[in-house]
């Protein structure tokens, strides 16, 4: 599996995880959901990028996506 395929798979898994989490938390308030979502995204991003320098740029991009997602949810 090359870097592009790994990156695509990671982003797909991340989106699936975020989507599932969001649906599970819809009963709670939006701000609680957003905070929980950020914690989960932080964990996933760190887990996926900690061992690979190739993913450092991805980590920055994902943090930006995370912030935008939060603003969009609000």
UniProtKB/Swiss-Prot annotation:
The organism's place on the tree of life at top rank: Viruses
Chief site of localization: host cell
Subcellular locations according to the entry: Host cytoplasm; Host mitochondrion
Pfam families reported for this sequence: Rota_NS6
Keywords from the named record: Host cytoplasm, Host mitochondrion
GO annotations of cellular component type: host cell mitochondrion
Family named by the database record: Belongs to the rotavirus A NSP6 family.
Subunit and partners: Interacts with NSP2 and NSP5.
Full protein name: Non-structural protein 6
Organism lineage string: Viruses, Riboviria, Orthornavirae, Duplornaviricota, Resentoviricetes
């Amino acid at each position: 599996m090359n870097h592009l395929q790994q990156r695509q798979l990671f982003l797909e898994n991340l989106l699936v995880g975020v989507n599932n989490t969001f649906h599970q938390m819809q009963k709670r308030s939006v701000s609680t959901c957003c905070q929980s979502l950020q914690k989960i995204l932080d964990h996933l991003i760190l887990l996926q990028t900690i061992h690979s320098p190739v993913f450092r740029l991805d980590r920055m991009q994902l943090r930006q996506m995370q912030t935008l997602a939060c603003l969009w949810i609000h």
